[in-house]
Each structure stands twice: as C-alpha cells, then as structure tokens.
Amino acid sequence: TLLLFTLCCTLVTAGEKETIYQAYLTNDMDTWKTTIEAMHAEVDKSHERELELLNYEYGYVGWCIGNNRKSEAKRYLERSLERIDRLKAANYRIPQMQAYESAYLGFQIGLARLKAPRLGPKSLDAAKQSVANDDQNALGYIQLGNIDYFMPPLFGGSKERAIEHYRHAERLMAPTGKGDWNYLALLVQLATAYEETKNIAMADSIYRKSLSVAPGFSWVRDELYPAFTKKHQP
C-alpha cells in the first residue's frame, strides 16, 4: 500500500506540473490560479509540495505584476513569503530559498519602485548567495539575469551581462526543460534580451528553439514571434 500511496502522490504532482505547463502554453491563468488555490488548501503539505506550490505562485505573482493586477499580486506575494520563511526555518533547500527570496524582493520593487534602493541590494545578495551555495541552481542564475536586465545601466544594470546569466541558466535547465514552464519563460526572456541588445539572429534562434520544445506555445507562436519577424524582416 505504501508503494501505491507513493505512486498516487507522484501522479498527483505530475498532474499539477502538466496542468500548469498546459496553462502556460495556452495563457490560461484561470486554471493556473485554480491549481494553486487547491494546492494551498491541502493540509500537512510536505516540504517538497510547498516548494512546488511556491514555484507556481512565483509564476502567478510575476504574471499579476506584468498585467497590473497589483492587489492580487500582493495577496499571493504575502502568502509566498510565509511559505519561504517556513521552508527556510526547516532548513529546506536553502539555495533554492535564496533564489526565491531574491525573486520576491524583485517583485516588491516591481510593485513599488521607490523600494529599489533599499531592496535591490538585498535581492542581489540573495541571488549571489544562492549560486555560491549551489552552482547548479538555475533559478539563482535567472535572478542574477533579471537583476541585470531590469536595473537601469546608471545603477549598474547590463543587458549583456543579463544574457550571460540567462545562458548559464539555460544550459543547466535544457536537459530537463521539456514540460517545464520555467524553461519556456527563460527562453522568452533570453530572446527578448537578445532582441534588445540588437542580436536579432540569436533572438530568432531562441524563439525557434522555444517552438521546437513546445510547438503549442501560443504566446510565442501567435504573438511574440510573428511580431518579431514582421519587425525584423529584411
């Protein structure tokens, strides 16, 4: 029965990962939200389950901020911060927690730009610690990339350096990237950074890569890539 129980649990987790992935492919954020609400309501979640939920909340908060749903973003952000605190207190996968801490400090800056001078350095420190403690931690490199990408050059940001961090993360994630929304999100961010630094050929190649990994990725297939090719056609 224990084996059966373990199998069921694994299937449940695989189910949510697939549900979130399909929601990302089709921009179905209602399903994404329903999934995280159902997971949040579960009692006695394992640390692993909390971490999985944290990743989906991370995606949802980022989407809320990007779509100017600030009050909703704040609600989920506060919930995630409590989750990070619990997992840190349990000493669970600390490098991952440091990467999420960095990301959530970035989200707080996204919600209130005036906090940047105070929270920006903390976000950078957390990301640096995250990769110092685990050099295979792709999420840590993504945060280093995001910090360089979003920080104005005047304050030390650099899109070229962001690309190096994103590429590092991409190399780490590529072997297990299929079926993972985080990998597709990284490819979009990398393509965007290449386009903004005028490296059109590389941007094109990364967009194509995302569609070879996920031909049904509607955001890239129907919006981003057609707009990109139209803008840069010879």
Question: Model-predicted segments: where are they?
Answer:
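Single-residue signature of alpha-solenoid repeat helices
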Residues: 32-35, 73, 80, 123, ...
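Boundary/linker segments of alpha-helical solenoid repeat arrays
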Residues: 47-48, 138-139, 170-180, 213-225
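Bacterial N-terminal signal peptides
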Residues: 1-10
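Amphipathic alpha-helical repeat scaffolds of TPR domains
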Residues: 15-20, 45-66, 92-111, 136-152, ...
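TPR/TPR-like alpha-solenoid helical repeat scaffolds
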Residues: 178-193, 218-234
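Hydrophobic/aromatic packing residues within the alpha-helices of TPR/SEL1-like helical repeat arrays
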Residues: 36-39, 77, 84, 127, ...
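Canonical positions in the second alpha-helix
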Residues: 39-42, 87, 129-130, 169, ...
